[in-house]
Amino acid sequence: TLDDVQGLAKDCRLSTRDAYRLLCAAACGLDEEAESEDQGMERDYFRPGIHELDPAECRADPYYQTIRLPNVQKNGWRMGYRRIEPCEAFTADNLLLLPDGREVPQLGYFLEAFDAPMVEQDGREWMTVTPSERNTMLGDIAAARGNVAVFGLGLGYYAFMVSQKPEVARVTVIERDPAVIALFREYILPQFPNRQKITLVQADAYDYAAHMQGFDTAYVDIWHDVLDGVEMYLKMKRLEPASPQTRFLYWIEPSMLAWLRGMALMEIAENETGPMLQTIGPVRDYDDLCEKLSQDGIRRIAARIPLEIARR
C-alpha cells in the first residue's frame, strides 16, 4: 500500500522507488540481507524492472487531454474509466532486452490514483488506454507514415495519435466487431481533431490484409496479450508478402519474439527438435545460434513458424 511504501521510505531514508522495490522483493520471498542468488535476482531484475511513473506525464498525453469517455452502457458494453490505485502494479512497457540475454519485465506504479479509459463487455475488461498501452505504442506511432492501415480499433489511441502527424495522410481502421465501431463512432470519433483523416471499415483483419492496396504503414493490434497474440501474429506475418510496399508494425512484437525465443530455448533444453528448431534449421556454431535467436533473426523466420507453436 501507499502507507507501506512511504513508511519504509521514511524509516530507512530511501526513495519511494527503492522502498517499493524492496517491498516487492520481500513479497516474492527474496532475502537481500543474505549472500545468495536472491541478491543477484534483485539486482539484475527488480532494479531495472520496477518504475515509479509520473501520472502528470501520462495525463499530458494528447489522447488523455482530448478524449473524455462518458459512463454509458449499451448492448452488454460499458464505457468509462478504471481506477488504478496508488502503488497498484501494472505492466509498464515491453520486455527490456539486455545485451547479456536478460529479458526483464517492466513493472510500473503511481503514488496516486489514476483513471484510465476502459471498455468492458459483459463485465470483462476488453479495451483500455493505460500507461502500458501508451508506452508500448510510442515507437510504432513514431514510425507511421503516409496512408496507414490500423488493424484493431480498441479505444482509438493509435489512430488518434497517428492522425495528429502531418506526415500521415489517411488512417483506415479495420475492426471486425460492429458494436465496437458503433460505440467509437458515437462517443469517441467526434472528439478527434483530425477525424477527417479517419475511415472505419468493418472487416476481418486477415481477409482485409490479404487484398489491401495503397498503404505505406500497417499497424496490427488485434490481441490482448502475448499468449493470445502469438498465433495471430504468425498468421499476419504470412500475409506481409501480399503488400510488399507496406511496412508492418505489431503491438508488443518484442515480447512475442521473446516468447518464441523462449520456446526455442525450451526445445534445446529438452533436446527436442520441435517446431522452432525445425524452422531455424542447421546451426553452425554458438554465434550463429545467437544470431538466429535474436529479435531480428526470429522476426525473419516468423512467417514460416508453424502455428502449432502457439498451442504448446
Identify the residue ranges that each predicted region occupies.
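N-terminal auxiliary segments of SAM/dcSAM-dependent transferases
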Residues: 1-110
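Conserved alpha-helix/loop element of class I SAM-dependent methyltransferases that forms part
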Residues: 113-118, 131-147
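Conserved class I S-adenosyl-L-methionine
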Residues: 145-156
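Conserved acidic residues
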Residues: 146, 169, 216
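Conserved SAM-binding loop of SAM-dependent methyltransferases across substrates and taxa
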Residues: 155-167
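Conserved SAM-binding motif I beta-strand of class I
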Residues: 170-175
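S-adenosyl-L-methionine
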Residues: 177-217, 225
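C-terminal substrate-binding/active-site "lid" region of AdoMet-derived donor-dependent transferases
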Residues: 224-312
